[in-house]
Each structure stands twice: as structure tokens, then as C-alpha cells.
């Protein structure tokens, strides 16, 4: 396996946005691959048994870090457990992996190896969260955004506007429920979704065309849409008074030029990594337990992969035998008009065995003893 990756550890969010993979182009170009993209992570997984042009892949992904083989597999299992996340143990990454895998499968872009890998990673992520406390406190990017707002500005008796009622917005909402907020407003392009989330928060929903009025009313604004373009620009916020805006959307909802406004304090995902986390130490203590699960499941995965490899060899061997059988049978049928059946069957069986022996001898001449002993295709069931 080959992984190309770029994440928050090496690049700030504005750079990651420019590095984002166009998934339509990606899946049109490659087979046996899956791309996983989040607000602070871009990763593409390749089955190199099928994508043999590794140099071509590396050329396409200059600037990305590269992992291969065992290192790539261990990395992905850690990612699924939230051990490689900005917020240790966060739950959202597991859902993002599932969604990415499902998309690749629907496009028929995975392989037997990648299917095994992703199903195993999902299982490992579930085990880690069930059997350990790596996700203690329900941590997420959404909850970190709320913690940032509370720590730096206080949320008591504040009016909060949540823009976006999708997955990320829901995570923010769950964190907001515990806070003593004066009023919560939810804005979303699909009003019904805003209304549903607002009811959970005991707040109010607004139509997107009333966004400016909602901004004027609010003290703190948390942006969490899935819009492909900016929804707030500098011109939209010049005359709205002093506001705190936390943008956790992917890609970003707020144009970076907004930082030039004196009345706006703008925070993005990069700012969340420094937020203190009261449960962090207890989650750090769970790392050895998670690593043990990863080690156990890695061994299981390797056995599954070995089985897949054997099945592939047997499939190729059966195809090879069938090809010889058909060719020799065609010869026997032609001879059946001129020779007796016993002689035909004798010649057929000898030709069949001779062809297999010839191919094996040709293979073994230039093969080391070790490689020859590890070759199973010629053993025919032994």
C-alpha cells in the first residue's frame, strides 16, 4: 500500500485548502484508491498491486508526505482511532473514513485489499472507542470551537449564531447545549434542517436570506457549513459591530480578508489546537491500550491479506490450467476423427502434463531457491 498525506501538523489550513484533491478528477484517473479529506487532513490510499506506477503517483502529489507498506497500514489504523487527530480521540474522523470508503466503493474504485484495510480500520476505531476512554468527553472540532469561545470570551448571557446545520453544525450544537447561553440562532440554506437543530437547542431558526439580521443580533458566530465557497466576506461584516467569529468549516466559510476589520475577531481551525482540554491527560493515558488493540488487529489484518494473496494465486493458477486444458482439448477433438479414443486420451494427458512441466521448468531456471519454495502456484493443492 501507498499513502500520500498532508495534514495540520505540517501545513496551516489555508495551505491545505490549496492542496485539496479534486475527487472527481482523482477517481477518473486512478483505480484501487480511496481519498479521505477532512478540515485538517488530506490523504489518498493506493493499492500498489494495481497502481504499479508509483513514480507517477508521487509526481502527481509533490509536497505530500509518503508512507508505504507496514508504516502506511499502522498510520491508517491510528488515524481511525483519532490518535493522529488535532484533538486526540475525536469521534468525527471515524464517520469521515466510513463516508470516504462508501463513496469509493460506490464508484467501484476499491480493491479486495483496500476493502479489507478500510473495514479493519473502521472496526479498530470502534474497538478503541468502546474498550478504552480515548474519546472521553465526546471531543470534536465542534466542541473545541465552543470551548475556545467560552474560554476567551465567555458564553454566559451571549447570543450565539450557528451557521450550518450539517454534521459539523450538529457537533457544535451538542457542545452548546451544556452552556448557559442567552439565545441561540441557527441559520442554514435548508431551513427545515436549521429548524430541527434549533429545537434541540431551544433556540430559533432563520432563513438564509435573513443572515445579516441574525449576525447583527449575535455576539458570537460559529460557521460550520459544507459550502464550497465563502459565505461571509469583508463587505458583509463592516457595519455589524464587534463580533467573534469561529470558522470551522471545510473549506472555510469566512474570507481571510475579514481579519483586516477591527470590529471582528476571526478564529479558524488552526487556532483550536491550543485550546486546553480538561480530559486530555486521561485520554493520553489511554494511548497504550489503543496501541495494543492496533497491534492485535494488525496481525489479524495481515492474515486476511495473506489469505487474499493465496486466493489470487489460486485463481491465476486455475485460469492457467483452464487455458491449457482448452487448447489441448481442441487438439484432441480434431484428432478424434482419425485415431482411436484410448490413444487420444493418452496423448491428451501427456500433452497436458508436459505443458505444465515445461512452464514450471522455464519459471524455475531463473528463480532463487527461496523464491521457488515460496511459490505455491505449481504445487497443485499440496
Swiss-Prot record:
Single GO molecular function: glutamyl-tRNA reductase activity
Residue(s) at site: Important for activity: 75
One GO biological process term: protoporphyrinogen IX biosynthetic process from glutamate
Pfam families associated with the record: GlutR_dimer (PF00745), GlutR_N (PF05201), Shikimate_DH (PF01488)
Keyword flag Nucleotide-binding: no
Signal sequence residues: none
Record-linked InterPro entries: 4pyrrol_synth_GluRdtase, 4pyrrol_synth_GluRdtase_dimer, 4pyrrol_synth_GluRdtase_N, GluRdtase_CS, GluRdtase_dimer_dom_sf, GluRdtase_N_sf, NAD(P)-bd_dom_sf, Shikm_DH/Glu-tRNA_Rdtase
Keywords for the protein's UniProt record, in alphabetical order: NADP, Oxidoreductase, Porphyrin biosynthesis
Taxonomy, superkingdom: Archaea
Positions bound to NADP(+): 164-169
Pathway assigned in UniProt: Porphyrin-containing compound metabolism; protoporphyrin-IX biosynthesis; 5-aminolevulinate from L-glutamyl-tRNA(Glu): step 1/2
Keyword Oxidoreductase applies: yes
Listed EC numbers: 1.2.1.70
Recorded catalytic activity of this chain's protein: (S)-4-amino-5-oxopentanoate + tRNA(Glu) + NADP(+) = L-glutamyl-tRNA(Glu) + NADPH + H(+)
Residues noted as binding substrate in the record, renumbered to the chain: 38-41, 85, 90-92, 96
Catalytic site: 39 (nucleophile)
Function: Catalyzes the NADPH-dependent reduction of glutamyl-tRNA(Glu) to glutamate 1-semialdehyde (GSA).
Note: During catalysis, the active site Cys acts as a nucleophile attacking the alpha-carbonyl group of tRNA-bound glutamate with the formation of a thioester intermediate between enzyme and glutamate, and the concomitant release of tRNA(Glu). The thioester intermediate is finally reduced by direct hydride transfer from NADPH, to form the product GSA.
Family label: Belongs to the glutamyl-tRNA reductase family.
Domain notes: Possesses an unusual extended V-shaped dimeric structure with each monomer consisting of three distinct domains arranged along a curved 'spinal' alpha-helix. The N-terminal catalytic domain specifically recognizes the glutamate moiety of the substrate. The second domain is the NADPH-binding domain, and the third C-terminal domain is responsible for dimerization.
Subunit architecture: Homodimer.
HAMAP family found in the cross-reference section: Glu_tRNA_reductase (MF_00087)
Protein name per Swiss-Prot or TrEMBL: Glutamyl-tRNA reductase
Source organism (scientific name): Methanococcus maripaludis (strain C5 / ATCC BAA-1333)
Lineage, opening ranks: Archaea, Methanobacteriati, Methanobacteriota, Methanomada group, Methanococci
Name of the gene encoding the protein in the UniProt record: hemA
Amino acid at each position: 500500500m501507498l499513502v500520500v498525506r498532508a495534514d495540520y501538523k505540517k501545513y496551516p489550513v489555508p495551505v491545505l485548502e490549496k492542496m485539496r484533491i479534486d475527487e472527481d478528477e482523482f477517481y477518473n484517473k486512478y483505480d484501487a484508491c480511496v481519498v479521505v479529506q477532512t478540515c485538517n487532513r488530506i490523504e489518498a490510499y493506493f493499492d500498489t498491486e494495481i497502481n504499479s506506477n508509483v513514480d507517477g503517483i508521487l509526481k502527481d502529489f509533490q509536497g505530500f508526505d509518503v508512507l508505504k507498506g507496514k508504516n502506511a497500514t499502522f498510520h491508517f489504523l491510528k488515524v481511525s482511532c483519532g490518535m493522529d487527530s488535532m484533538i486526540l480521540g475525536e469521534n468525527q474522523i471515524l464517520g469521515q473514513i466510513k463516508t470516504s470508503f462508501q463513496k469509493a466503493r460506490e464508484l467501484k474504485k476499491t480493491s479486495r485489499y483496500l476493502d479489507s484495510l478500510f473495514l479493519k480500520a473502521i472496526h479498530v476505531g470502534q474497538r478503541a472507542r468502546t474498550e478504552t476512554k480515548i474519546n472521553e468527553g465526546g471531543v470534536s472540532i465542534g466542541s473545541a470551537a465552543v470551548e475556545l469561545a467560552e474560554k476567551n470570551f465567555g458564553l454566559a448571557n451571549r447570543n450565539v449564531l450557528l451557521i450550518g446545520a450539517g454534521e459539523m453544525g450538529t457537533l457544535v450544537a451538542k457542545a452548546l447545549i451544556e452552556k448557559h447561553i442567552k439565545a441561540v440562532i441557527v441559520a442554514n440554506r435548508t431551513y427545515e434542517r436549521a429548524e430541527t437543530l434549533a429545537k434541540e437547542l431551544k433556540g430559533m431558526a432563520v432563513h438564509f436570506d435573513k443572515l445579516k439580521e441574525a449576525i447583527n443580533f449575535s455576539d458570537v458566530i460559529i460557521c460550520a457549513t459544507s459550502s464550497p465557497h465563502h459565505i461571509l466576506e469583508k463587505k458583509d461584516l463592516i457595519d455589524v459591530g464587534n463580533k467573534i467569529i469561529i470558522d470551522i468549516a471545510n473549506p472555510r466559510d469566512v474570507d481571510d480578508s475579514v481579519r483586516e476589520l477591527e470590529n471582528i475577531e476571526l478564529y479558524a481551525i488552526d487556532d483550536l489546537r491550543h485550546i486546553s482540554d480538561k480530559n486530555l491527560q486521561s485520554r493520553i493515558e489511554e494511548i497504550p491500550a489503543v496501541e495494543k488493540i492496533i497491534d492485535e488487529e494488525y496481525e489479524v489484518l495481515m492474515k486476511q491479506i495473506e489469505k487474499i494473496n493465496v486466493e489470487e494465486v489460486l485463481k491465476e493458477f486455475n485460469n492457467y490450467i483452464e487455458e491449457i486444458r482448452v487448447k489441448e482439448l481442441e487438439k484432441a477433438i480434431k484428432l478424434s476423427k482419425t485415431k482411436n479414443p484410448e490413444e487420444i486420451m493418452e496423448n491428451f494427458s501427456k500433452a497436458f502434463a508436459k505443458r505444465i512441466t515445461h512452464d514450471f521448468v522455464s519459471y524455475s531456471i531463473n528463480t532463487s531457491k527461496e523464491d521457488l519454495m515460496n511459490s505455491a502456484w505449481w504445487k497443485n493443492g499440496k
